[in-house]
């Protein structure tokens, strides 16, 4: 990657490949900017990096990319993100991605349709996903093996907030 400068939110999201990559560990940040934006990671929430990164790119000022590797990091195999999915982790991920879509819409950031299909819940056993519930706008689709749509229904904002 060559050195690039971007000030527009749409271009910053594109350069950072966000979505789907909401990584915070591949960005160097100025302390003053973090203080100005009041950015903090929320505690006891998984996928908090989605909220953090969307605000960072959407409100953080100019983005400069650099062509060189600046630092390296190691992925912890025992980390929360590498551990087994739980209903709480799935709910946190759903809420984070739903908030991102709302944030993008409020700021006029164009999203590919595939990033508007949000997985609400997955059910699986033995490494096989047998049912996945996906939301797209005001519709929920239940998909067998994440391939075959078997049920669709319209959802209200209250149902989406309650997780039903």
PLM-predicted stretches and their roles:
Residues 63-66, 110:
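Generic macromolecular interface patches on structured domains
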Residues 23, 72-164:
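C-terminal subregions of glycosyltransferases and related glycan-biosynthesis enzymes
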Residues 1-64, 74-88:
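Donor-binding/catalytic cores of nucleotide-activated saccharide
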